[in-house]
Amino acid sequence: MSPKILSEDEILSVLRLLKEHIQTRYKVTRIGVFGSVARGEASPESDVDIVVEMEPNLFLRADLKAELTARFGRPVDVIRYRQEMNSRLKSQIDMEAHYV
């Protein structure tokens, strides 16, 4: 049985519920969703692309990724948004991301 397709609204609802916890535990100042979920093109095989604004800390980002993967029951990519990042990815995030 394929995993359920999670809608953008479902993802954002969970992120809203977890926002204070995520800000405190992971030092995240902003969190949102982008990619296929934000475009309404997610399939059962799609991962969830999450964008965060936070200080560079690979350990905290890895822990956040693990927590969200467990919460959503599917692979999650956590991308740290910053001024000096891949310009194509930055443009995609700028166009697609919806934040809580």
Q: What label would you give each PLM region?
A:
Residues M1-R30, A38-P44, M54-V100:
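Catalytic core of pol beta-like nucleotidyltransferases
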Residues V33:
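Conserved histidines in hydrophobic membrane contexts and catalytic metal-binding motifs
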